């Protein structure tokens, strides 16, 4: 078979991706025979990069995937996980039917999982929800979902939970990974999400990675960074982390810093900029304002924890006070080169070189960060601090210059943040605490005034605590695996799930750790078994069509949400005051009120697409995905969140919002790029009425838990290239599982020697919360400094999150998975 140049490049890219993971691909797989295969586009199911792939189907199955050569994001490339996308749906243990714990023919908390019908499943769910609402009110009924559900599913969830069941206890697992970034974006700019785009990679002169192993977690973007670095010797890469990983292989300046000390480093950089007269005064005076944050704000622990009791400003953690440049200068002034070195352990010459990069007006610079930055008990502060240095120098909203928060899930932006599936949010950056925002939603959704509660519900970690304490009694977990992925499993998560007062539902395609701990498992369609839409890290919205059917009785998350709404009549969940405003809703179901409202149900299924599949539209009798999207899109149009029309996204490889007059926006807030910035304004941060971004003064504060005499090591957790999050999908791909079958604990050889341990030894990692048996690695891809160990959480056989501390950022509620105290002994 002859290969074109494009085919040859794609084939070699596949081999390179496999080699990075230690996988040898059979020669026949490099350019497989595609006769009889139908190809269509879809965004990748894994990280937030938003790669587009071509999905090959034959005889009702996905048989192959390949990088989409027409996609701007990945340009025909796949990482190793993307290469094996075709296998994620075909694990031998797919859940085929709803499974309810039963004993003697009825539900029993300690019963065995027994097949039931969808009607039986929804009936007992509705019974539990109605009883809980009657006894304790809306916030005792919760949903925990993710940035992996589609935009349509997220929007349907928000409507059912916040409007239908009148509960704001709905949160995504993005609370564990992106909440601090989102909160800091909103506080700094008045709007969420990055102002730049991936085009910055090819236009910048320098990259600084803060707590981000892009080589393994965002490998396609890393390939673009590598190409930029290797094509121009003037381009520099700085990689900053608490341990050495694969991204260090490209670093011109590799920096290892002590956990939590990024706060001190960033304040030093701000101080350096000021002391060396490198402030861009024209930009700062025109486009910024100064605020001061509260200090001593606690650690998001239970109120009775000594650290919480000792903190002075727990209740005002998020408060910002008007300030000035002079006050900001005083806040950062103590962070000298000497002090930053003392706190961080970073050599002075490296700190100074880093500060000079940010300060040099001729140096274009992009800052990238992910979980090492966000999963932090001062995550909001540290996000503010990175914005501070970009704002002080004016290196923002400009090609090749900007702060860029990367996401870890395919639609953490599109579904969790933009749609508003957080406890406090509504679509398009609106919030439940703002009466005007609530009024806008109630009017658009044709609801009685006062339907949507105005107080946030229980966020992720609080959901676990409230389940344990008996204040949250119904939880529906969808498209995530918190029993493995959440913090402090033994003490805070498992007790609540098995609390006999509570009823736990898990929608999942596989029997995950969460699923087997639940009371009811609902079999769920995956990826291209449904029509969907994702929003990636650069504000790019991407659509795909359903391409195959799900197995047996599997149903999409969208179908489950909307169908479940049929089990509630308005008067069963709304009070008489609401019913009196709209008596015509009496006797109607939430399905009729929320989804047969003349908006969601007004589009017919297309008849001009050969082989078109849409199981949800077939069941409901209308094009529900289009109806949901067009209703949702109205909230952002004209307000800086403009989305294109539905059909456009099916034709394109995604568009970056705001999309105005058919044109996407690459750089927000900048004249000439953003249609919301008028001629002559240069920059305008229009999330705030005055168009100014906030520079926030906050100090370094110590972490919630540090090593001591007994627990003498830092423990940090994260991921590896081959597996994604809790491994529910990737561990069912034989090639990925074989390449990295089990979790390891990485340790410095000197630390191992002190403990009488050697590479490969079976060890026990112990913290104040739990212990885990694993094997030691002192030679592998991750090289820890003395005093720190690193492990991953993909392995259901080890459950690393038995070890982690459930401390959170007090402002965002995001969990700090990156630092707690541990000890290691031979097992």
UniProtKB/Swiss-Prot annotation:
Write out the catalysed reaction.
2 Fe(II)-[cytochrome] + nitrate + 2 H(+) = 2 Fe(III)-[cytochrome] + nitrite + H2O
* Posttranslational modification: Predicted to be exported by the Tat system. The position of the signal peptide cleavage has not been experimentally proven.
Compartment annotation: Periplasm
Matches recorded under Pfam families: Molybdop_Fe4S4, Molybdopterin, Molydop_binding, TAT_signal
Q: What is its EC number?
A: 1.9.6.1
Residues in domain 4Fe-4S Mo/W bis-MGD-type?
37-93
Sites where the protein binds [4Fe-4S] cluster: 44, 47, 51, 79
Q: Name one GO biological process term.
A: cellular respiration
User: Per the entry, which co-factors are needed?
Assistant: [4Fe-4S] cluster; Mo-bis(molybdopterin guanine dinucleotide)
Keyword set includes DNA damage: no
SMART domains linked? Molybdop_Fe4S4
Q: Name one GO cellular component term.
A: periplasmic space
Q: Where does Mo-bis(molybdopterin guanine dinucleotide) bind?
A: 81, 148, 173, 177, 210-217, 241-245, 371, 375, 481, 507-508, 530, 557, 717-726, 801, 818
Q: Which residues hold substrate?
A: 793
**What binding details are noted for the cofactor?**
Binds 1 [4Fe-4S] cluster. Binds 1 molybdenum-bis(molybdopterin guanine dinucleotide) (Mo-bis-MGD) cofactor per subunit.
The GO molecular function terms of this record are: 4 iron, 4 sulfur cluster binding; electron transfer activity; iron ion binding; molybdenum ion binding; molybdopterin cofactor binding; nitrate reductase (cytochrome) activity
Q: Say what the protein does.
A: Catalytic subunit of the periplasmic nitrate reductase complex NapAB. Receives electrons from NapB and catalyzes the reduction of nitrate to nitrite.
What the record says about family reads: Belongs to the prokaryotic molybdopterin-containing oxidoreductase family. NasA/NapA/NarB subfamily.
Q: How does it assemble?
A: Component of the periplasmic nitrate reductase NapAB complex composed of NapA and NapB.
Which HAMAP family does its entry note? Answer: Nitrate_reduct_NapA
- What name is this protein filed under? Periplasmic nitrate reductase
Tell me which species this is from.
Haemophilus ducreyi (strain 35000HP / ATCC 700724)
